[in-house]
Structure formats: structure tokens, C-alpha cells
Regions:
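N-terminal leader/linker segments that initiate helical-solenoid repeat arrays
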Residues: 17-57, 61-66
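Register position in tetratricopeptide repeats
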Residues: 32, 64, 98-99, 132-133, ...
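Structural marker of alpha-solenoid helical repeat scaffolds
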Residues: 49, 81, 115, 149, ...
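Helix-start (N-cap) detector for alpha-helical repeat units in TPR-like alpha-solenoids
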Residues: 51-53, 86-87, 119-121, 154-155, ...
Length: 369
């Protein structure tokens, strides 16, 4: 009788394990095919006796549907049945990151890492937690550990560079962006970001011969990155290669006409920057070019001191009266505080930038004491 009972119990256990394995396989297939709604609809309500891995797949479905609370609920159920599987610890930690619960996330990432020490995603997620808490040294440590593992994702390479950039350590940031460029896929947004920052940081160092190819490559990959057009224009103006800048200016005007430009490019773009005495000069050009009978600014020179304060503005102003009288289209004027100055110097659309710049600098000399 005891042998029969034992055999019966073993048979029941075998059938249960077989059923659980079958359910897990089914859930894995559904998950691989991204059928997350189906997983939730068909399995979430009857998962009481499911295996740890099956519960994990249900939690993963909630994770992909951005249902944070249910995701954590099922990850906890999975962990309670099998605490040695790193996957639910990692997904729970990632969810806690999304919820802004970074200290809780850190503990879960650390548990996942203790179980499996060679997963780059785990270190990357832990780096994200520390980054959000502005613990940059610990974030760097974990992003760097991520890059030491096999199959490292793009993010740690980008974030190492970003942290150095945040800390104003531009030389280290530039080196890290070059490393990121060499490691990550050209098809990713991270590659575009690396190119832009290489161009930006090389420009800040005055290495325009290195900045130019970075922006050119970026625009070949993404012709809608209009900030890169402006950066290339600045490079060419710095080198007095005005003919090279013109096609990129035309692209910005075309994009403006189509309503494609946003934020600080919506009304104007910076086409030159230079140092004058102890001041930074930023020069902008506005897209407006229509005679509506009103005065408008076309080219604007901002004179900025070491505290980032604009101490003087010099601009070409469209003058409808001058045009009506057959004179110049633009008059060179200046503003200092509430005071407006008219130099009496005129320009037209065929102006030479070197002449405009020289005239503007004379006004800097006149009005900055």
C-alpha cells in the first residue's frame, strides 16, 4: 500500500513539474514574440501555483507594459520561489529606477550582481541608480565595470563620457566620447550623440579640423540634426570659409520655412563665436527677411562678460524708411541697457561679413568702457 501511495505521489509531482515546464515554455514563447497582453490576460489571474520562471515572465510582461506595481509584485513572487535567479532581481531593480526609488534599486542590482558577476546590464543599471543620486564616482565605477564584461550595451560608454562632461572634465569627456564612438553601433542614437559631443568639444578646443568631420558624418546619418548645421556654420565662419557655410545656412532657412525648427533655433541661429578682449562674442542671424513696414533685427552681436551677462548688443536693423528712400536695407545699431545707439552705417543683403564684424567691433570699443 505504501509503495502504491509513494508511486501515486511521485506521478502527481512529475505531472505538476511537467505542467509547470510546459507553462514556462509557453510563456517564454509568448514573451519572445512580444505578446505581453496575451500573457497577462491568460496567465496573471491563475498563476498561484506557477513556477518561479513562469512568474518572472508574467512580471516581465507587466514591465514591458510599464505597469510598475504589478511588475514588482510578480518579481517578488518569483524571487520568493527562487532567490538564486538574477533575472527577477534585475527587472525589479530596473523598475525601481523608473519609479525614482534609486536606493531600493541599488540593493536589487547588487543582489543580481552577487548572483551573476559578469552581466554588463546589471552594472549599467547600478550605474544609472548612482548617477540619478549624483554619486558620480560610484556611477563611473559601475559603468566602467560594465564595459569590462562581454556584450556590453551602448549606454555605459555614453554615460562615462556624459559624467566627465557634467563634471566639466572636458579632456576626459572627449576621450570617452571617442571611445564610445569606436565601441557602439552606428545605427544607435548613442553614436549620433558621441559624434555631436566630439564636434562640440573639439570646437571648444579650437580643433576645427577634427570637429568638422564629426559634424559632417553626423549629418550624413541624420540630416535633420539642425543644431549640427549651426555648429558647422560656426566652424566655417571661424575659418573664413563663408562659401562652405552657405549650403548649411540655406538648409536652416528651408527648415524654418517648413516649420521644422524648435527651441533656440526657431527664430535664429548662431553662426559665429569669437573672443574680443575679455568678452565672448556670439553672433546670430534671424530668419526674418520680409518687409512688413516694421523694424526688425537681422544680425545680432551679443557681448558677454565672464559672469555670462550680456553687457552690449550690436545689431543690424531693417529700416523700412531707409529702403523707401532708396538707402541701405539695414542700419547698424547698438543697445546698452535702456539706451539705443544708431551708428549711421548701412548694409545690404550682399554685405561682407568681415566688414560687418569690423564695424561691430568699433561699436564695442565705443560703448564698452
Amino acid at each position: 500500500m505504501n509503495k502504491i501511495l509513494t508511486t501515486f505521489i511521485l506521478t502527481i509531482c512529475s505531472l505538476t513539474i511537467f505542467a509547470q515546464d510546459k507553462t514556462t515554455d509557453e510563456l517564454k514563447t509568448l514573451s519572445d514574440n512580444k505578446q505581453y497582453d496575451k500573457i497577462i490576460e491568460q496567465h496573471a489571474s491563475k498563476s498561484k501555483d506557477y513556477s518561479a520562471k513562469s512568474l518572472y515572465y508574467i512580471g516581465l510582461a507587466y514591465y514591458m507594459k510599464e505597469d510598475d506595481n504589478n511588475c514588482i509584485k510578480f518579481m517578488d513572487l518569483s524571487i520568493n520561489k527562487d532567490s538564486k535567479d538574477p533575472a527577477p532581481h534585475y527587472i525589479k531593480a530596473s523598475t525601481l529606477n523608473y519609479m525614482g526609488k534609486y536606493n531600493e534599486a541599488i540593493k536589487c542590482f547588487q543582489t543580481a550582481i552577487n548572483i551573476k558577476t559578469d552581466d554588463a546590464e546589471f552594472y549599467s543599471g547600478l550605474g544609472d541608480s548612482y548617477y540619478q543620486l549624483e554619486k558620480f564616482d560610484l556611477a563611473l565605477e559601475n559603468y566602467k565595470k560594465a564595459t569590462e564584461q562581454n556584450e556590453c550595451p551602448d549606454r555605459p560608454y555614453s554615460m562615462i563620457a556624459q559624467i566627465y562632461s557634467d563634471l566639466k572634465q572636458n579632456d576626459k569627456a572627449l576621450e570617452a566620447f571617442y571611445t564610445a564612438k569606436s565601441k557602439i553601433s552606428k545605427k544607435s542614437n548613442s553614436y549620433i550623440n558621441a559624434l555631436f559631443n566630439i564636434g562640440l568639444l573639439e570646437s571648444l578646443k579650437g580643433n576645427y579640423d577634427k570637429a568638422e568631420p564629426a559634424f559632417v558624418e553626423l549629418l550624413q546619418l541624420d540630416p535633420t540634426d539642425y543644431h549640427s548645421y549651426a555648429k558647422l556654420i560656426q566652424i566655417y565662419y571661424n575659418r573664413k570659409e563663408y562659401d562652405k557655410a552657405k549650403p548649411y545656412k540655406d538648409k536652416l532657412y528651408e527648415a524654418h520655412k517648413k516649420g521644422l525648427l524648435k527651441d533656440n533655433l526657431k527664430d535664429m541661429f548662431c553662426f559665429d563665436q569669437f573672443k574680443w578682449n575679455d568678452y565672448l562674442i556670439q553672433v546670430f542671424e534671424r530668419y526674418e527677411n520680409e518687409n512688413k513696414g516694421d523694424i526688425y533685427n537681422k544680425h545680432i552681436f551679443y557681448v558677454i562678460d565672464n559672469s555670462d551677462k550680456i553687457v552690449l548688443r550690436v545689431q543690424t536693423e531693417f529700416s523700412p524708411i531707409s529702403v523707401e528712400l532708396g538707402g541701405s536695407k539695414y542700419l547698424l545699431c547698438a543697445n546698452k541697457g535702456a539706451t539705443h545707439y544708431n551708428s549711421g552705417i548701412g548694409f545690404n543683403d550682399d554685405l561682407k561679413y568681415d566688414d560687418l564684424k569690423a564695424a561691430a567691433i568699433k561699436l564695442f570699443d565705443a560703448y564698452i568702457k
